[in-house]
């Protein structure tokens, strides 16, 4: 065949592909929400900024409204933007959109655990996990004592910095890591423990990689990209290593299990596995238990650690806020008493600051992907089963009608005219509905108590002028990743 013939054949193929794509789009989208026209193979990839997909969603919402459709490759995605649409999907249609959209980088977790799972296995595992965590003190006195005990170790580690500059990533991260480790395994790590540091390093690296443009691309075009070199290989290697660690700990627990005296969360899951010993379709397999534990270890460590780390940077940017916090802590708690969760009721400013930190950093801007579990009539549209559904949390947390000047850090967003704490129904940092964060109660408690303990004993000192601190995230994707920085903590007794 001549070069001209090849060129003509290629053009005919491309035109045919385009016509087929147009026909499919018209045929399948007549009852879908509106959205930009997708190209063959790539969909709407060229209309999205892979380094800031949440911003792209906001721009598309301005054109197409609060409910719109985009395609990433052949993957159909319905995006919900704004408080009303997001709340409607998460709370009023919580069954119809309770599925978890596929995330190829977490393939090793597919059909297991409490985050990336679907169907009966997910429902039973999640329900049992919530009940068991309550029994082990989730959000109650048992966990308060855990956090207070860990705050002591955190303060000791901070004192050992002797006022010198340090990177807070792993030092601060050890505190929530140890809290969740105690719940899962009844294990406490030294702050220099190599295993703990390795785990936190992988958690931290995964959080960053998941937020890069390449992983956004990979998760939507994995069929084409899986055999290429790239950071997806490192991410999946880390995920497998974390799962292997969890499986090893689960097997250790199995070999020393005393059913009459469960030690921790892992023991209770193993006891359920024993009950299903003769079941033809057991839910609590070793693999499912290991992935459940790995899910909770990763989420329970990295999200709280990142929020604390971002929060300290924000307080250095706004020293007047830190000064008000010191005043409230001194007045309510004093220099010696351990902060308690009951203090939250009489410390509206700290409560407001903790909420505003979470709102401002908007840690998981696009939520985790949901999925339609059945063909669903939603407003004037039909959303087919299997459609990925994204209820954007940033559109709620940055709603200018609820939070005036949302791009500014203002604790007053959560204070009324009398200086009392003001709850907002727009505060959806943990999502809502059937996929709400399992560890919400624990995370809220940790953020309040750890922040109170740190500021009770230390002043924060930036290495640069506060006005030169840049709060912009270094990556925006799965999460918003804070910039790297160092700080000094100065014992307040020396001030």
Swiss-Prot record:
GO annotation terms (biological process) = epoxygenase P450 pathway; xenobiotic metabolic process
Principal place of residence: endoplasmic reticulum
Where substrate binds, per the record, is at: 298-303
| SUPFAM superfamilies, per the entry | Cytochrome P450
Which UniProt keywords are given for this protein, alphabetically ordered? Answer: Endoplasmic reticulum, Fatty acid metabolism, Heme, Iron, Lipid metabolism, Membrane, Metal-binding, Microsome, Mitochondrion, Mitochondrion inner membrane, Monooxygenase, NADP, Oxidoreductase
Q: How does it sit in the membrane?
A: Peripheral membrane protein
Write down the InterPro entries for this protein, in alphabetical order.
Answer: Cyt_P450, Cyt_P450_CS, Cyt_P450_E_grp-I, Cyt_P450_E_grp-I_CYP2E-like, Cyt_P450_sf, Cytochrome_P450_fam2
Which top EC class is given? oxidoreductase
Q: Describe the reaction catalysed, as an equation.
A: an organic molecule + reduced [NADPH--hemoprotein reductase] + O2 = an alcohol + oxidized [NADPH--hemoprotein reductase] + H2O + H(+); (5Z,8Z,11Z)-eicosatrienoate + reduced [NADPH--hemoprotein reductase] + O2 = 19-hydroxy-(5Z,8Z,11Z)-eicosatrienoate + oxidized [NADPH--hemoprotein reductase] + H2O + H(+); (5Z,8Z,11Z,14Z,17Z)-eicosapentaenoate + reduced [NADPH--hemoprotein reductase] + O2 = 19-hydroxy-(5Z,8Z,11Z,14Z,17Z)-eicosapentaenoate + oxidized [NADPH--hemoprotein reductase] + H2O + H(+); (4Z,7Z,10Z,13Z,16Z,19Z)-docosahexaenoate + reduced [NADPH--hemoprotein reductase] + O2 = 21-hydroxy-(4Z,7Z,10Z,13Z,16Z,19Z)-docosahexaenoate + oxidized [NADPH--hemoprotein reductase] + H2O + H(+)
Q: What is its EC number?
A: 1.14.14.1, 1.14.13.n7
Regulation of activity is described as: The omega-1 hydroxylase activity is stimulated by cytochrome b5.
Q: Which cofactor does it need?
A: heme
Location comes to: Endoplasmic reticulum membrane; Microsome membrane; Mitochondrion inner membrane
A single GO CC term for this protein reads: mitochondrial inner membrane
- Family annotation (PROSITE patterns): CYTOCHROME_P450
Pathway, per record: Lipid metabolism; fatty acid metabolism
Subunit relationships: Interacts with chaperones HSP70 and HSP90; this interaction is required for initial targeting to mitochondria.
- Family note: Belongs to the cytochrome P450 family.
Q: What is this protein called?
A: Cytochrome P450 2E1
Its source organism is: Sus scrofa (Pig)
Taxonomic lineage of the native organism: Eukaryota, Metazoa, Chordata, Craniata, Vertebrata
């Amino acid at each position: 065949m001549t070069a001209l013939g090849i060129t003509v054949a290629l053009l005919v193929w491309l035109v045919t592909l385009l016509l087929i794509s147009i026909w499919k789009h018209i045929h399948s989208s007549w009852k879908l929400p509106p959205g930009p026209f997708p190209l063959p193979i790539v969909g709407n990839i060229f209309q999205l900024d892979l380094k800031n997909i949440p911003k792209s969603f906001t721009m598309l919402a301005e054109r197409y409204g609060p409910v719109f459709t985009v395609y990433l490759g052949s993957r159909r995605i319905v995006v919900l933007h704004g408080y009303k649409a997001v709340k409607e999907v998460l709370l009023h249609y919580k069954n119809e959109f309770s599925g978890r959209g596929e995330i190829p980088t977490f393939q090793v977790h597919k059909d297991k655990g409490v985050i990336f799972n679907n169907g009966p296995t997910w429902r039973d595992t999640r329900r049992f996990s919530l009940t068991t965590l309550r029994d082990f003190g989730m959000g109650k006195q048992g966990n308060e004592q855990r956090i207070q005990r860990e705050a002591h170790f955190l303060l000791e580690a901070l004192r050992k910095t002797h006022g010198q500059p340090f990177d807070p990533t792993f030092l601060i991260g050890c505190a929530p890591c140890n809290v969740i480790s105690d719940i899962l395994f009844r294990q406490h790590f030294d702050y220099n423990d190599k295993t703990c540091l390795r785990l936190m390093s992988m958690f931290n690296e995964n959080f960053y990689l998941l937020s890069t443009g390449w992983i956004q691309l990979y998760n939507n075009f994995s069929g084409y990209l899986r055999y290429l070199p790239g950071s997806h290989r490192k991410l999946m290697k880390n995920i497998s290593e974390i799962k292997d660690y969890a499986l090893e700990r689960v097997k250790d627990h199995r070999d020393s299990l005393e059913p009459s005296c469960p030690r921790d969360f892992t023991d209770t899951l193993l006891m359920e596995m024993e009950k299903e010993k003769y079941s033809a379709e057991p839910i609590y397999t070793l693999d499912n238990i290991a992935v459940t534990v790995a899910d909770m270890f990763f989420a329970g460590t990295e999200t709280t650690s990142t929020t604390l780390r971002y929060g300290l940077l924000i307080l250095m940017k706004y020293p007047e806020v830190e000064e008000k916090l010191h005043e409230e802590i001194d007045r309510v708690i004093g220099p010696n008493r351990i902060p308690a969760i009951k203090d939250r009721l009489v410390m509206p400013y700290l409560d407001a600051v903790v909420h505003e930190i979470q709102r401002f950093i908007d840690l998981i801007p696009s939520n985790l992907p949901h999925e339609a579990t059945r063909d669903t009539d939603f407003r004037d549209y039909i959303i087919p089963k299997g459609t990925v559904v994204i209820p954007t949390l940033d559109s709620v947390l940055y709603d200018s009608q609820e939070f005036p000047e949302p791009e500014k850090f203002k604790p007053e967003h959560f204070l009324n005219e009398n200086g009392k704490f003001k709850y907002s129904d727009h505060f959806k940092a943990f999502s809502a509905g059937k996929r709400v964060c399992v560890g919400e109660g624990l995370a809220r408690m940790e953020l309040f108590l750890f922040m109170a303990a740190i500021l009770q004993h230390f002043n924060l000192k930036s290495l640069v002028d506060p006005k030169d601190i840049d709060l912009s995230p270094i990556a925006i994707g799965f999460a918003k990743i804070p910039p790297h920085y160092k700080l000094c903590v100065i014992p307040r007794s020396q001030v």
